[in-house]
Amino acid sequence: MKQLTILGSTGSIGCSTLDVVRHNPEHFRVVALVAGKNVTRMVEQCLEFSPRYAVMDDEASAKLLKTMLQQQGSRTEVLSGQQAACDMAALEEVDQVMAAIVGAAGLLPTLAAIRAGKTILLANKESLVTCGRLFMDAVKQSKAQLLPVDSEHNAIFQSLPQPIQHNLGYADLEQNGVVSILLTGSGGPFRETPLRDLATMTPDQACRHPNWSMGRKISVDSATMMNKGLEYIEARWLFNASASQMEVLIHPQSVIHSMVRYQDGSVLAQLGEPDMRTPIAHTMAWPNRVNSGVKPLDFCKLSALTFAAPDYERYPCLKLAMEAFEQGQAATTALNAANEITVAAFLAQQIRFTDIAALNLSVLEKMDMREPQCVDDVLSVDANASEVARKEVMRLAS
């Protein structure tokens, strides 16, 4: 039985992870749950899964959780703060850590799990976008096993040979017969919109994703294809891929989640319903398989599958991300931070849709691109880029 810590248990990935546990109580036991401020959901999770520990981000939330659990007769020990989250990620009895805390808050707990040599089910995008080199160096030193949860990276992982899976981030693709990795994306809701009309697109229009249901921030990232740009950065680190070994493809139906092209002409793809429980269950059970609760893909109901190359005039954010990777971790960190500010400004109707890419570029041009040497350096770049982005938004919005 695998012992599990879930970082970010009350978020959507955390809830889906617990659903997989629910379907497979004989395979998984929850040791620790870590969350932000959602006490109500954490109470429900603690009562159902009886973890030894529950950690809330702040003391007030932890106090409330403790009171509510005691009233219900729960014996779960309640803790608070980032150090407690890091401790849960490194617990001796834990085999697997689901790293699903969103944003910079997830960096140190994920790094703690890596340094403790755990199997890390990686769902925190920022880990590799901002700390790719730092994290991959730590993986090598501690011999931790990274398993990607993101549907595209998980699809690539499943389509790669075992020697690469067991030495993720360091195995040589070419030596293992791999020519390239094909990263697919839907192209978002504005795939067919005339370029001249993009400036007038509203937040509500940007948030109507055709295939996946997701939050407003990531919906906008899908519309700009910044999400694919960030996934490109992650894939370069995860699979030790050069620029020439990466292809980005628009695949509007989102049925093929990504592919791998081999030297002999074969292309291996992973298909499935667009449901995050599939990649989550895959990483949890790897190298075995368990029931995820996802309905089987019905091939008879599929429409034609189509593919196209991305147009960088339509998706300048994608190009920005690809170029930022070549500049280093300071650039990818700054781009990610700037994008959070510009997307929030677009959602608040302070700037136009087309201003997102323009402002992201403007921030990159103003930043000091010295390579960060530790997580604190990364957080400093993140904070500086956010500040520059806020000023750029104010300049444009005034």
Swiss-Prot record:
Q: Recorded E.C. number(s)?
A: 1.1.1.267
Q: Which HAMAP family does the record match to this protein? A: DXP_reductoisom
Provide the alphabetized UniProt keywords. Answer: Isoprene biosynthesis, Manganese, Metal-binding, NADP, Oxidoreductase
Q: Which residues are listed for Mn(2+) binding in this entry?
A: D150, E152, E231
The protein here is known as 1-deoxy-D-xylulose 5-phosphate reductoisomerase
Which reaction(s) does the protein catalyse, per the Swiss-Prot or TrEMBL entry?
A: 2-C-methyl-D-erythritol 4-phosphate + NADP(+) = 1-deoxy-D-xylulose 5-phosphate + NADPH + H(+)
| Xref: InterPro entries | DXP_reductoisomerase, DXP_reductoisomerase_C, DXP_reductoisomerase_N, DXPR_C, DXPR_C_sf, NAD(P)-bd_dom_sf
Q: Which gene does this sequence derive from?
A: dxr
Q: Does the keyword ATP-binding apply?
A: no
Of which family is this protein a member?
A: Belongs to the DXR family.
